[in-house]
A protein has these predicted regions:
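Short acidic-hydrophobic, aromatic-tinged amphipathic segments that line or gate anion-handling sites
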Residues: 3-9, 185-189, 309-314
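Conserved NAD(P)+-binding/catalytic subdomain of aldehyde/semialdehyde dehydrogenases
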Residues: 181-268
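Short acidic loop-to-helix transition motifs that present clustered carboxylates
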Residues: 114, 165-169, 188-196, 337
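N-terminal Rossmann-like NAD(P)+-binding subdomain of aldehyde/semialdehyde dehydrogenases
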Residues: 1-126
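NAD(P)-dependent aldehyde/semialdehyde dehydrogenase
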Residues: 266-382
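Conserved small-residue-rich beta-alpha loop and adjacent elements
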Residues: 110-175
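Single conserved hydrophobic/aromatic residue that forms the stacking wall/gate
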Residues: 406-416
């Protein structure tokens, strides 16, 4: 492998670049392509879904049924899994369920002198469509991080879509789907899968809301169907921003950057070094690990084309850069870091401490790893139980006499 070509930039240069929004994901060229895919599936249903999948993903499906898996199929695949994998999946399942059960979403019921009941009630969204990313790698954890939360919320029907992959990877995804309580699974990915969830086909039922991360095409498809169906967010390629004041010992931090970069060539990695020194040793460690990594080519492209390595003077400058990015994952390695500072950071998820990593949070902590990307952390949040619920306002008046206490007048129209 050729030498890793990554450069460091100063605080002023990084700030100017980020203020111009050049680091945000640009998917303008995808819009028309995705629009045509959605219209095709919406109009032609199963036929379009099969044709697009066979063309893009090189599958050989003749019917949607060939790519469909019911509860019995999912159980059979779970039984094929290695016991160690089952143990790991069940460990993660327990943590996710325990975390989200601890989030309280109680109904509100009150009254006043006019209304005998004023309040809001919660009910689960009935039909959920879940997308689990794939392609060069598969992510069974994405199934657990969404489906289990939907189950805690009480959703009745949960349908999973994931891209075509090897038989071994497919068995893992389908087995995980069984553990997560999936109703049906479909071996379709990309914008056409989102369209099938949003509008349904002859075989696939329409979803009320779509969840799950994906690539640029998936994010753009979710953007275009929003309004006809609910979505969790426009999550795109994986992101990590690391703030560190370490001066030596970069093995773990290099691995953390690589863990995000290996998701795809469009993954974004930012490293902010507080104080002088450090980056040179980090670059050497990255070079070593990328050379040894199984997906070194993908990692190298992500680090060279979509990443930034920034030297700043202090934590204040680091916070400023971070908040211009609003990353999906933020790791903070800073001596004597104070918890009171956490609310100053804009990020989808924050991982504090040298022994804590985004990977740990993504797979085993408990909170969902479906997190806002592309600066959306400024106005949105990670997927949680509230996202699988709808609130309805409720009022009740028992006595007609109470109506006389309501004073409503027609607003005066301005004269012209």
């Amino acid at each position: 492998m050729k030498t890793l070509k990554i450069k460091k930039v100063s605080f002023p240069v990084a700030k100017k670049y980020l203020l111009q929004s050049k680091f945000r994901n640009q998917a303008v060229n995808l819009k028309e392509t995705v629009r045509k895919i959605i219209l095709n599936v919406k109009k032609n249903g199963d036929k379009a879904l099969i044709k697009i999948s066979n063309k893009i993903d090189k599958t050989e499906f003749k019917t949607v049924t060939e790519a469909s898996f019911n509860k019995s199929d999912l159980k059979k695949n779970y039984e094929k899994l290695d016991n160690a994998i089952k143990k790991n999946l069940n460990f993660i399942k327990k943590r996710i369920i325990n975390f989200h059960k601890a989030i309280k979403t109680s109904d509100l019921k009150t009254k006043d002198g006019i209304f005998n009941l004023l309040g809001q009630i919660h009910k689960p969204i009935d039909r959920i469509g879940l997308y689990a990313p794939g392609g060069k790698a598969v992510y069974p954890s994405s199934i657990l991080m969404t489906a289990l939360v939907a189950r805690v919320a009480g959703s009745k029907e949960i349908n999973l879509f994931f891209p075509s992959s090897s038989e071994k990877a497919k068995t893992l995804m389908l087995g995980t789907a069984h553990l997560a309580g999936i109703t049906n699974a479909y071996n379709f990915g990309g914008a056409h899968a989102i369209a099938a969830m949003a509008y349904g086909t002859e075989t696939i039922s329409k979803s009320d809301k779509i969840f799950g991360p994906g690539n640029n095409y998936v994010a753009e498809a979710k953007r275009q169907v929003f309004g006809d169906v609910g979505i969790d967010s426009f999550a795109g390629p994986s992101e990590v921003l690391i703030i560190s004041d370490k001066k030596k010992g970069f093995e773990q931090l290099a691995a953390d950057l690589i863990a995000q970069a290996e998701h795809g060539e469009d993954s974004k990695c930012i490293f902010i070094q507080i104080g002088k020194g450090g980056l040179g040793d980090l670059f050497k460690e990255l070079e070593r690990q990328v050379t040894e990594a199984p997906r070194g080519k993908t990692i190298k492209t992500a680090l060279e084309k979509n990443s930034m390595f920034i030297q700043v003077k202090n934590l204040e400058e680091a916070i400023e850069i971070n908040n211009l990015v609003g990353p999906e994952h933020l790791q903070i390695i800073y001596k004597n870091f104070k918890e009171s500072l956490l609310k100053r950071f804009i990020a989808g998820a924050i991982f504090v401490g040298e022994n804590n990593t985004a990977v740990l949070g993504d797979y085993a902590a408990g909170p969902s790893h479906v997190i806002p990307t592309n600066s959306a952390a400024r106005f949105s949040s990670p997927v949680s139980i509230e996202d699988f619920l709808v609130r309805t306002s409720v009022t009740e008046i028992k006595s007609i006499k109470n109506l006389s206490l309501i004073h409503i007048s027609e607003p005066t129209r301005p004269s012209i």
